[in-house]
């Protein structure tokens, strides 16, 4: 059928990534805010009650690798257990031979009716454009996730 359409379909450029910058007065606070920012892409963390606790211990040789493993572990918890994190996170970050995080995440099973859906499903963490730096009296963590 003839009409004014140019073609039946067209593929356009689309970026399937989201860049996140998380800030904190301390490195620990920045890592906590990185976790909350990740969760907020999918649901409303302020609606999550801290009913259950999940302990996480991770380590890595450098801070960039530690950030990657931190976000990757949070994605794993949501993907496999549908564990929605609340804004209540107890996090200890330190360094012995390697950097480590010992954290307790508080939350509950994800419920779309209660927690909502903010529009994105995060598929994976990436090292693309990752940056961790101290700026004056605060820290900035930057990372990109694939959605």
UniProtKB/Swiss-Prot annotation:
Which residues participate in Ca(2+) binding?
A: 17, 146-147
What GO annotations for molecular function exist for this entry?
Answer: calcium ion binding
Q: Does the keyword tRNA processing apply?
A: yes
Q: In which domain of life is the source organism classified?
A: Archaea
Annotated GO biological processes are: tRNA splicing, via endonucleolytic cleavage and ligation
Q: Which Gene3D superfamilies match?
A: Archease domain
What keywords are annotated for this sequence in UniProt? Calcium, Metal-binding, tRNA processing
SUPFAM superfamilies listed in its UniProt record: MTH1598-like
Q: Name one Pfam family in it.
A: Archease
> TM segments?
none
Question: In UniProt terms, what function does this protein have?
Answer: Activates the tRNA-splicing ligase complex by facilitating the enzymatic turnover of catalytic subunit RtcB. Acts by promoting the guanylylation of RtcB, a key intermediate step in tRNA ligation. Can also alter the NTP specificity of RtcB such that ATP, dGTP or ITP is used efficiently.
The family database entries (NCBIfam families) matched by this protein are listed as: PRK00407.1
- What HAMAP family does this protein's entry cite? Archease_arch
Q: Which family does it belong to?
A: Belongs to the archease family.
Q: What is this protein called?
A: Protein archease
Originating organism? Pyrobaculum islandicum (strain DSM 4184 / JCM 9189 / GEO3)
């Amino acid at each position: 059928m003839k009409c004014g359409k140019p073609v039946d379909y067209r593929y356009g450029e689309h970026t399937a990534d989201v860049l996140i910058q998380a800030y904190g007065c301390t490195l620990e606070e920045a890592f906590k805010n990185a976790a909350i920012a990740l969760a907020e892409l999918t649901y409303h963390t302020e609606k999550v009650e801290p009913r259950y606790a999940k302990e996480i211990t991770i380590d890595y040789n450098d801070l960039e690798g530690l950030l990657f493993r931190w976000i990757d572990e949070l994605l794993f918890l949501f993907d496999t257990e549908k564990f929605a994190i609340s804004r209540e996170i107890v996090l200890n970050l330190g360094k012995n031979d390697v950097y480590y995080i010992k954290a307790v995440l508080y939350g509950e099973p994800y419920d779309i009716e209660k927690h909502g859906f903010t529009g994105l499903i995060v598929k994976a963490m990436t090292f693309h454009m990752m940056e961790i730096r101290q700026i004056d009296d605060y820290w900035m963590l930057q990372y990109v996730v694939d959605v």
